[in-house]
Amino acid sequence: MSYASDVKKELTNLAVHRENAKAELMALIRMNGAISIANHHFILNIQTENPAIARRIYRLLKQFYDVDSELIVRRKMKLNKNNLYIVRLKTGTDMVLADLGILKDYQIVEVAPTEVLTDDAAVRSYLRGAFLAGGSVNNPETSRYHLEIYSLYEEHNHMISEMMNQYGLNSRTTDRRGGFITYIKEAEKIADFLSLVGATNAMLKFEDIRIMRDMRNSVNRLVNCENANMDKVANASSKQIENILLIDATVGLQQLPPKLQEVAVARLEHREVSLKELGTLVPGGPISKSGINHRLRKINQFAEQLQKDA
């Protein structure tokens, strides 16, 4: 089961609170519902590939409305295709849709009523329904951080984004596959959204994974930095040794001033050590790192002058 499926499973197991659960049902029907007409009556089909979501829609309808509804399973013949679960409402469809603010004067209303947008519990409930209907979230262990909710209507998509941003989630919108998405890419904001809609266990798992990823990234950056420093030291040491050998082969190390000669000999004898360690190995030492570095620069300048004079 994917991480997104785990999130939705947790959400479908949440207790239904009568005072705000209509907002969740409102989002589920607005985003996954399809209206048809048969025998001069409206029929509502609410479709999903997730059986737990279908059962939750069915329970919500039964809890709020005394209507004739049924749960239908359509098996797909193609390989690797999920079954399609349909909650069908045959009677009272226009009454239910009007009560939920989805149908007005026989026209579809693309956004939620104002009272939903201004009530904290209702906003959380609506966002939960919207995520169940059209949401997805990447596995934080293997992918880039990304959570999105797909909506068919642009105005509705912007409304979802506005709802999210009431809580500082920094969501953005864009068009996608004949519709629109609201998305979040910041890890902390994704965790905040999961907590907001009630997926507490999924949020805690997400945070654990995020913290471990951040720690691994910090360690990797530190290792890369240390490796870069080691390469820098190795390259500098190689150049120093090359110049010292040039001086020795050309005029002899005895031509160097005594203090430079001591450092040159010590470097040849201890080619792998750092400047700080080299300072403790010079006969006239210990010499500070900056002191050793100064003398090695003088040796390099001496070698460069020999090359110019050659």
From Swiss-Prot:
One annotated GO biological process: regulation of sporulation
Pfam family, one: LAGLIDADG_WhiA
DNA-binding region range list: 274-308
Gene Ontology MF: a single term: DNA binding
Record keywords, A-Z: Cell cycle, Cell division, DNA-binding
InterPro entries, per the entry: Homing_endonucl (IPR027434), Sporu_reg_WhiA_N_dom (IPR018478), Sporulation_regulator_WhiA (IPR003802), Sporulation_regulator_WhiA_C (IPR023054), WhiA_LAGLIDADG_dom (IPR039518)
Range of residues in the leader sequence: none
Keyword ATP-binding attached: no
Function per UniProt: Involved in cell division and chromosome segregation.
Protein family according to the UniProt entry: Belongs to the WhiA family.
Protein name: Probable cell division protein WhiA
Organism: Lactiplantibacillus plantarum (strain ATCC BAA-793 / NCIMB 8826 / WCFS1)
